[in-house]
Amino acid sequence: MLECLSALLVLFAGGGGSVLAAVQSKTVADPNLCPGYNSQLISPFLSSCKRNLSECVSRYFDEQYAFCRSCVTVNNETMEDLDNCKCLQCALSSLNNSCFHDYCTSKDEYDKLQIVVEQFQLTNGVLDDGEILKPRGNKFSSRKLSYFVGQNNTLFRNPLQFEKNQLISALLTSLTNNQKTISSVDMFEVVDANNEVQYLRERTISGKTLSPATGYEEENDGDCSVKDKKWEGKIEYHENKKVSSENCSKDTDDKSGSKKERNTKAPLFHTATEIHMTRWSSWRPKKIFTRYLVNEYQSPKIITTVNRFYRTKTDTETGTTLITSTKAKRRWFPRTKIVTSTATSTFLSITTTTTTNAIATKSLVAVLNPDGLNKKAGINFGLFSANGELASPDEGGTPTVVRRDKISDPGAANEQATLFSTTFSQVPHLPELDSGEFISAASQLDERIFIFTAITVSITTLMMLGFSYRSRVSFRDHSIDDSDDDNDWSDDEVEFDEEYFYSLPVSIPEKGISLDKMAQQLGVE
């Protein structure tokens, strides 16, 4: 067998560089692989169960929990089996819930089984049935071997059929006090010193060989190279003995000289091939073939990896374009400009007011000559004629028209008012005068008339004050007896001397302006 295996490895490694990796795996079929389970501490108690109890446990093994199909915990780096606690949990659950009442009859044994299950759950904890496992493919995966990723990137794999059968058999053996009641299963043993290949132990009972181990397909006795039907020709059986046309498994032991015929079944190998497309060149991609030689026995696993690498010549054309960029830095001085917008609204308001007042004419008598009191001259402040005669009392009043312009500025909050006044005076017709020009007194209301009027009023007021005050009389000349006489201001007791009369510079204009000129100055059309 070793010669056949060596020849097979040389065949795979002949095309290119090869890497041979041997992964030492722990025994999944051993219940003691679970840290919380020790078969030596459990006293066997099963004795009333049927022989085919293991078949029932194996049949309902996968139906207990969702993780029973991938219950072996694997190391992510070394790909070694860490523990089989979940597989052991599935086997105990299948025995307790599905098979005990149909294959066993003792109630005491059932009570002891409940104690074992409870102790296992207390030691290992309650296993999570709701954990979602995602498939993960790698170079160790095959049609019978699948890997899954759980929480915290924990890696799991499915137990092979013979591993599951051996685990169930070992569990029932540790719980049974009479091993004859449990159906025997085929066991594996290591026959070579290097643990590279493991053979199936053969047993001869009454001149017949045992049936193949559980999990393998039937083999053809007449053909030496039997292929598994389920694997469709990808699983090969290899013989390590000389093959003859009559019997493929006959061999003679040279050392012992025994001529006993032995029927030996070689370990099961299969080859997995992965093809990868290179990305070194987009127009000439290359294929990389990776082949794995996998031994599906539990221990050890021999994996042969063949990698072929190709060298690709790549021509690269590089075009260079020179791009020159110039950056100019300019200093900017910030400037602040304040723009003020002012809105001005002008409203024109024209108010026309017509007022007619009767002008009363009074005469103020003033003494113009200091020599006598007989000659008097009348000064008329109303309408008068050019010859200085007093105006007639029948002369009418003067209509006055006043126009007021108002300009309002809402923005500046200013208000300007312009007053235009126009006075129309009428001079009555004097039929007794044959010649001469009738002049209105309103025509004399210019700047000189106003000054003349103000001076006249001031002088008149001073004269009235002078009449009521005697400058030459002192307070010492009066006595208390004369105080009553001083309060008498009757006209008959007033005497005027020449010292009390003064000449006034009174000038009366002889001629006024015309109506047209006065209207032009006043701006009346």
UniProtKB/Swiss-Prot annotation:
Keywords carried by this UniProt record: Membrane, Signal, Transmembrane, Transmembrane helix
Region described as Disordered: 242-264
Side Cytoplasmic, residues: 470-525
Subcellular location: Membrane
Positions on the Extracellular side per record topology: 22-448
One GO cellular component term noted in the UniProt record for this chain: membrane
Annotated TM spans: 449-469
Membrane topology: Single-pass type I membrane protein
Name assigned to this protein: Uncharacterized protein SCRG_04024
Organism of derivation: Saccharomyces cerevisiae (strain RM11-1a)
